[in-house]
Regions:
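N-terminal, membrane-interfacial amphipathic/helix-forming hydrophobic leader that caps
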Residues: 1-89, 95-96, 244-258
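Residue-level signature of transmembrane alpha-helical entry/exit and packing/kink sites
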Residues: 17-29, 53-57, 86-90, 136-144, ...
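Hydrophobic, lipid-facing residues on alpha-helical transmembrane segments of integral membrane proteins
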Residues: 23-27, 31-35, 39, 88-107, ...
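Membrane-water interface at transmembrane helix exits
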Residues: 36, 40-44, 68, 101, ...
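Juxtamembrane helix-loop-helix connectors linking adjacent transmembrane helices
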Residues: 75-151, 169, 199-203, 256-258
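Transmembrane helix-loop-helix hairpins at the membrane interface
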Residues: 138-258
Length: 258
């Protein structure tokens, strides 16, 4: 498929002249959103205020809605799943992906800041320590609800939706999945791998490599979930499952008890 065929009917009128589901648009979007996200997350790691990061996920979710016409939204998978029962499989696949990363992190890095989930637990600002069981459950439900909505919807509409389809015309489905998964994994270095400590910013080479590789494979799982369900909802459900498992482990396996 040529870029000309992928452009005009897919984007809203104000954007049709400049944008298309092609490599150029994909690279522009990746460059812009990666740079902004790195800046916001790294600043949030210092200030412990993640409000703007949540706003950024909303912007990611709105971007396809703002840019794309109806046919474009359908093209990126914004349709009802052809196989709705696969959404449950997608959710479970996301949970399993996270569990494998949790186990490998514990085996390789122990309970220090070299463990991504331990480090990320430290970004949960304002939590009481220690917590009683009722408080822990309430906070887990709040954080799980946030984690299963903001980033899964925003990131999957962007990476497995808009970015992925920008590369399929030139690269095909499989190689486009490699591109969007690699971009997804790389940007998460801002969340872990390049970490903030009292002495300043520190790069953890081994843990960072493990983190990026793990999230690259996870991105491929999310792509599989989209293909298996026939809808971007599959990827969103898989991502939500991953975040549910991560939040559960942080609250019940990492944070101190009462």
């Amino acid at each position: 498929m040529t870029d000309a065929r992928a452009t005009s009917p897919l984007f809203r009128p104000p954007f049709r002249r400049w944008l298309g589901l092609n490599v150029r648009t994909g690279l522009i979007l990746l460059g812009l959103f990666t740079a902004v996200r790195f800046g916001l997350v790294m600043q949030a790691n210092v200030t412990q205020s993640y409000a703007l990061v949540s706003v950024f996920f909303v912007v990611m979710a709105l971007t396809p809605l703002v840019l794309l016409a109806r046919d474009g939204r359908r093209r990126i998978g914004m349709i009802w799943p052809a196989r709705p029962m696969r959404l449950l499989s997608a959710l479970l696949a996301g949970v399993l992906s996270c569990c494998l990363m949790i186990v490998s992190a514990e085996l390789l890095f122990g309970a220090g800041d070299d463990n991504a989930f331990v480090y990320i637990s430290g970004t949960y600002a304002g939590l009481p320590s220690p917590m009683d069981d009722q408080t822990r459950l309430i906070l887990f439900l709040v954080f799980a609800a946030i984690g299963m909505t903001f980033s899964p919807i925003g990131e999957e509409l962007f990476y497995r939706g808009l970015v992925h389809e920008s590369f399929t015309g030139r690269l095909g489905e499989a190689r486009a999945a490699v591109v969007d998964s690699a971009a997804f994994a790389f940007v998460h270095l801002a969340h872990f791998g390049l970490i903030w400590r009292a002495a300043g910013w520190t790069l953890l080479p081994g843990p960072a490599l493990w983190w990026v590789c793990g999230l690259f494979v996870t991105g491929l799982v999310f792509f599989w979930a989209r293909r298996a369900s026939g809808s971007i909802l599959g990827a969103i459900f898989a991502h939500a499952g991953f975040n549910l498992a991560m939040t559960g482990w942080i609250f019940y396996g990492v944070l101190p008890g009462a």
